[in-house]
């Protein structure tokens, strides 16, 4: 995390803590990892007044653009729906009700779409894998900038497809909420409990058996 991002993150944390909110969700790891990876988390509380600049959004998209890609096919297509726009309303309306409970606050919703065929019309076998890598890059870049993300799979794909004017060869895989973190007190009591719960992961021995 750069000095600028550290400053933004620190100021934001200080503001929330003065409101009685602790936004620190750093992962507790068994081995050292990059700080930006440890700090990445997926809150539901976003600042409802924040607006992202073109430069900020451009940096997020640039990070996705330079993620790894099978045969350099780059099958991802990213559609930015800024809060207050018609596209944002259409994408928001396509979200599952559980996501709608909080996803109106983030500064923007970014739809991650996979192009499922190659230029010659054959199946793009690694498209879904590659768009996941693009989303991961975007999320880590957001963390480095003092922002947070929350990736959602709960949405009506056909409604999003219609909103974006996509053909049958392009599939929406995720909607990514992006913006500065907000005060969890805006959430329902149930979501506040989930927001404040400690982060957990399966043990290394389970996900990587016999690695040593």
Regions found by a protein language model. Name each.
Residues 8-12, 16-212:
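Acidic, surface-exposed loops and disordered segments
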């Amino acid at each position: 995390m750069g000095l600028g991002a550290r400053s933004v993150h620190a100021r934001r944390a200080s503001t929330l803590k003065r409101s009685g909110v602790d936004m620190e969700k750093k992962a507790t790891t068994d081995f050292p990892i990059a700080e930006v990876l440890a700090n990445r988390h997926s809150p539901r509380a976003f600042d409802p007044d924040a607006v992202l600049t073109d430069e900020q959004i451009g940096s997020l998209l640039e990070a996705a653009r330079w993620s790894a890609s099978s045969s350099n096919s780059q099958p991802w297509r990213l559609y930015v729906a800024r809060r207050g726009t018609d596209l944002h309303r259409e994408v928001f309306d396509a979200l599952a009700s559980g996501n709608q409970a909080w996803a109106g606050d983030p500064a923007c919703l970014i739809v991650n779409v996979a192009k499922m065929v190659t230029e010659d019309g054959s199946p793009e076998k690694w498209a879904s894998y590659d768009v996941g890598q693009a989303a991961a890059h975007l999320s880590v870049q957001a963390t480095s900038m003092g922002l947070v993300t929350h990736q959602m799979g709960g949405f009506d794909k056909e409604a999003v497809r219609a909103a974006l004017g996509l053909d049958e060869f392009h599939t929406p895989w995720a909607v990514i909420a992006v913006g500065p973190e907000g005060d969890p007190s805006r959430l329902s009591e149930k979501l506040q409990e989930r927001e404040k719960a400690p982060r957990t992961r399966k043990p290394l021995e389970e996900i990587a058996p016999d690695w040593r």
